[in-house]
């Protein structure tokens, strides 16, 4: 289709040329035409001088416009340098933020290892504590059984006292039997004294075990509390680390985007510089009508004024962003100080946990020894119970056999009663001592509860401080996002201004090409006229 159009145009042009040649051949010898060919070049030469002067004036105006364009370009280069400096500042802050994140990750790994060690030691301590509690329960059951046996013996002594009052009348006929009974009572007293000694020993062992158990419980409670503290602090640090990683990823993406935009801007500026050089080379060849140049000039002036307005707006926004970045730096410094305080607090807690871990290892060895002693005492108590049951059964048989024969044992039974009362008072004293020890244990428990409440208050304070730090961090992140959005808007505006500048350069190129074409056309026309004039003179 394009070839067809070209052929049609060539055919029309050929017909026009043939018509013009035919007319020229017909009129070339006409006297008026000879006169016109002689006079017309002289008229066109005068008009050409006027046109050349007008073109020179247009050229001066174009040079002034070029100077203005160069000044605008210089301003844009200055703005670009300022943007590059701002970008370097942002890159430095980003690098500092990444370094801080790396240190936080290292601390988190250390805290995780400490947490694992504490959990293992705590589990071992809990297992040993369960074993100690079981052994203490067994000892308490044995003590309760011994107390029940003592109560039975006291009841039997009361029955014997009633039998004594009833058998005083038969005392005279049973002297021989009284001797044998006294021997039996002596043996019974020996067995009772042995049982009391064993009971006292068992009570002392129980007291020691209860004290050790209370100490172990206190240590386990402290370990649990410190573990809970560390777990809460680790969870909070993990959340902060996740947020910091997200912000880091966002900053890296924005950094890449800003770098790509800056690269594009540099390429565009280099292209504009080359175009401006080309325009400077081609400005000397401009020759076009005044109306076209004035219209182009007005369009360029309007575009330049718009660009200057946009540049002023961008400068104002950059100043606002610098103020916001300064405020954000202050907030970050505050948050870093608070984080350092919290890290020092966590290190103190780690030291406490390490000391507690050493105490638990020593406690494990003591627990093993105590378990062996508890097993030995359990066996001895079982043997004593068997022996006591056998002795009590023998005493019952003998007393039942000799009750009918006992007559006169008032004095001996009174002595036995006095002994039993002494033993009873001793048992009561031991019971009072055990009660006092239980009261002390309760007091220790209340003190431990107070300490736990105090630690919980400290945990709440730490949580509140961490919440404040998180709020400051979230504020800084929101400000970062706002700054980034504004930077994106500025980049878009800069790209628009560059696009407008490219359009202006294209318009300048088209004007230059039109000037070159008009100049060539004028030169060709003047040459043709001179040739015609010379040919007419030759004729």
From Swiss-Prot:
Q: Which domain of life is it from?
A: Eukaryota
Instruction: Name the job this protein performs.
Output: Myosin is a protein that binds to F-actin and has ATPase activity that is activated by F-actin.
Q: Which residues form a coiled coil?
A: 39-520
* Biased composition regions of type Basic and acidic residues, renumbered to the chain: 241-300, 440-453, 520-530
Name a GO molecular-function annotation: actin filament binding
Q: Where does the record place the region Disordered?
A: 241-302, 427-453, 517-539
Keyword Coiled coil appears in the UniProt entry: yes
Question: What name is this protein filed under?
Answer: Myosin heavy chain, clone 203
Q: Which UniProt keywords apply?
A: Actin-binding, ATP-binding, Coiled coil, Motor protein, Muscle protein, Myosin, Nucleotide-binding, Thick filament
Compositionally biased region (Polar residues): 427-439
Q: Where is this region: Rodlike tail?
A: 39-539
The segments labelled Globular head in the record are 1-38
Q: Which Pfam families match?
A: Myosin_tail_1
What is the organism of origin for this protein? Hydra vulgaris (Hydra)
Gene Ontology terms, cellular component aspect?
A: cytoplasm; myosin filament; myosin II complex
**Which InterPro entries does the record cross-reference, listed alphabetically?**
Myosin_tail (IPR002928)
């Amino acid at each position: 289709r394009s070839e067809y159009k070209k052929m049609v145009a060539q055919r029309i042009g050929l017909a026009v040329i043939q018509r013009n040649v035919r007319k020229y051949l017909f009129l070339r010898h006409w006297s008026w035409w000879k006169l016109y060919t002689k006079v017309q070049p002289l008229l066109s030469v005068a008009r050409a001088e006027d046109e050349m002067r007008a073109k020179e004036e247009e050229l001066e105006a174009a040079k002034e416009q070029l100077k203005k364009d160069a000044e605008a370009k210089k301003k844009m280069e200055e703005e670009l340098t300022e943007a590059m400096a701002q970008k370097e500042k942002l890159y430095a802050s980003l690098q500092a933020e990444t370094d801080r994140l790396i240190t936080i990750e290292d601390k988190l790994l250390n805290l995780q290892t400490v947490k694992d060690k504490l959990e293992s030691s705590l589990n071992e301590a809990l297992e040993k504590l369960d074993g100690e509690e079981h052994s203490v329960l067994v000892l308490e059951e044995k003590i309760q059984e011994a107390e029940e046996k003592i109560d039975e013996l006291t009841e039997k002594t009361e029955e014997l006292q009633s039998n004594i009052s009833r058998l005083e009348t038969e005392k005279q006929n049973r002297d021989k039997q009284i001797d044998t009974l006294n021997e039996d009572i002596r043996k019974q007293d020996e067995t009772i004294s042995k049982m009391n000694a064993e009971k006292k020993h068992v009570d002392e062992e129980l007291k020691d075990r209860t004290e050790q158990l209370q100490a172990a419980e206190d240590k386990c409670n402290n370990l649990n509390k410190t573990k809970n503290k560390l777990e809460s602090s680790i969870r909070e640090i993990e959340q902060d680390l996740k947020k910091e990683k997200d912000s880091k990823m966002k900053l890296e993406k924005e950094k890449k985007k800003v770098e790509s935009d800056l690269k594009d801007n540099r390429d565009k500026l280099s292209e504009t510089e080359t175009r401006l050089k080309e325009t400077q080379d081609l400005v000397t060849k401009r020759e076009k009508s005044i109306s076209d140049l004035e219209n182009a000039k007005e369009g360029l002036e309007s575009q330049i004024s718009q660009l200057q307005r946009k540049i002023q707006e961008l400068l104002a926004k950059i100043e606002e962003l610098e103020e916001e970045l300064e405020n954000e730096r202050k907030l970050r410094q505050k948050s870093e100080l608070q984080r350092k305080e919290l890290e020092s607090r966590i290190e103190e807690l780690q030291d406490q946990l390490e000391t507690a871990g050493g105490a638990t290892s020593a406690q494990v060895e003591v627990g093993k020894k105590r378990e062996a002693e508890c097993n030995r005492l359990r066996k001895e108590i079982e043997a004593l119970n068997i022996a006591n049951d056998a002795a009590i059964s023998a005493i019952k048989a003998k007393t039942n056999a000799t009750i009918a024969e006992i007559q006169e044992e008032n004095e001996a039974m009174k002595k036995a009663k006095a002994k039993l009362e002494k033993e009873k008072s001793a048992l009561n004293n031991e019971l009072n001592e055990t009660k006092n020890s239980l009261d002390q244990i309760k007091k220790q428990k209340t003190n431990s509860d107070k300490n736990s409440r105090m630690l919980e208050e400290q945990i709440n304070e730490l949580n509140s401080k961490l919440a404040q730090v998180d709020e400051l961090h979230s504020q800084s992140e929101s400000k970062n996002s706002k700054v980034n959005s504004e930077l994106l808007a500025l980049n878009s505006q800069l790209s628009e201004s560059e696009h407008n500048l490219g359009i202006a350069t294209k318009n300048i190129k088209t004007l230059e090409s039109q000037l070159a074409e008009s100049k060539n056309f004028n030169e060709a026309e003047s040459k043709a006229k001179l040739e015609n004039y010379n040919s007419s003179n030759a004729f």
